[in-house]
């Protein structure tokens, strides 16, 4: 006979801490008090516990790497790190916080990184591809250093969700793929005040291709540039078959979204661009062999507020671009500025003013 469940559920009434613990122990056993205390410390999936202090998150990561991978749970509060987090083995590592909060505060999980030059805040970079892993529900606030907030190389099936990155000293999220990187899910993040790019997908470092990845519902504000993708520092790799859905770009200092060299089969859907200092969307190359092609942009809304040079700037040998439906207005140059060697551009339901 199944255990009868009271309805409505019997409430837990308490007046102070001891009564709360007594009530929890009555329901869950003698470990309830320890469980509550453990929520204020760093815990990993091996069941090991560290105090909330600088350096201990890396110890928790190394501990699960020794066990083939796993998860680390961070407590509410602020931790100031003077060294970065490193995952340098081909094993899955998941780091979960207690929620985003404003930088510098402790209303959620707030990780301040005060680093020396040349060190990333969070670095997933192993000898070969890291399969699976992710970052969830906390704030990254770099206050010193000159590298990326989150840096990946050759990673697949990886998530970054509900992360707030403010004032990245270089890029907020940077894939610098010497090998292939795929199935990256970057969604529901807040990325603000980055010195350079909010998201940089660099497929040309080696032969690596960044592909089959998804960037959804991210909010960008006042970054040097919001999104940059392509064979940016070389021409061997590329970026292809990626989707950008429902991202919002506000008050970007430079270009909102830039594609440069060997970018193929990209879908930009539901984007809002507001008052970008450079072009809202810029697509270019350095020759016909490295052209960008098969790009779809729409629906899209670009409000230049009288300061954005061009809504969509198509240069080089860019080929097969579909723009619309949507609206592009408030620019100082053109809604769609098409270079002389750009071919096969189609506008569908696009209002330009």
Please give the residue ranges for each predicted region:
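Short glycine/acidic-rich loop motifs that flank beta-strands on beta-rich extracellular proteins
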Residues: 69, 82-84, 104-107, 114-120, ...
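N-terminal extracellular ligand-recognition/capping segment immediately after the signal peptide
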Residues: 53-58, 62, 69-117, 139-140
């Amino acid at each position: 006979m199944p255990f009868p469940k009271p309805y409505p559920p019997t409430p837990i009434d308490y007046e102070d801490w001891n009564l709360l613990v007594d009530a929890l122990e009555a329901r869950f056993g003698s470990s309830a008090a320890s469980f509550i205390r453990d929520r204020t410390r760093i815990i990993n999936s091996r069941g090991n516990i560290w105090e909330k202090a600088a350096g201990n998150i890396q110890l928790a990561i190394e501990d699960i790497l020794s066990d083939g991978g796993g998860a680390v749970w961070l407590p509410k509060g602020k931790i100031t790190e003077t060294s970065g987090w490193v995952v340098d083995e081909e094993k899955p590592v998941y780091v979960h916080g207690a929620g985003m909060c404003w930088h510098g505060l402790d209303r959620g999980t707030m990780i301040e990184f005060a680093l020396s030059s040349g060190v990333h805040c969070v670095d997933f970079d192993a000898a070969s591809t890291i399969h699976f892993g992710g970052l969830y529900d906390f704030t990254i606030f770099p206050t010193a250093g000159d590298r990326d907030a989150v840096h990946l190389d050759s990673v697949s099936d990886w998530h970054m969700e509900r992360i707030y990155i403010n004032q990245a000293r270089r890029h907020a999220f940077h894939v610098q793929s010497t090998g292939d990187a795929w199935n990256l899910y970057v969604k529901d993040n807040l990325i603000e005040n980055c010195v350079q790019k909010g998201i940089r997908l660099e497929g040309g470092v080696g032969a690596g291709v960044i592909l089959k990845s998804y960037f959804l519902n991210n909010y960008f504000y006042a970054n040097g540039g919001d999104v940059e993708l392509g064979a940016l520092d070389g021409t061997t790799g590329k970026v292809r078959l990626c989707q950008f859905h429902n991202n919002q770009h506000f008050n970007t200092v430079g270009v909102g979204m830039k594609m440069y060299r060997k970018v193929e089969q990209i879908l930009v859907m539901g984007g809002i661009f507001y008052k970008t200092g450079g072009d809202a969307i810029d697509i270019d190359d350095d020759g016909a062999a490295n052209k960008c092609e098969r790009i779809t942009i729409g629906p899209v809304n670009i409000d230049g507020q009288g300061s954005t040079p061009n809504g969509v700037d198509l240069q080089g040998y860019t080929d097969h671009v579909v723009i619309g439906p949507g609206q592009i207005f408030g620019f100082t140059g053109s809604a769609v500025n098409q270079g002389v060697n750009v071919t096969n551009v189609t506008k569908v339901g696009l209002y330009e003013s």
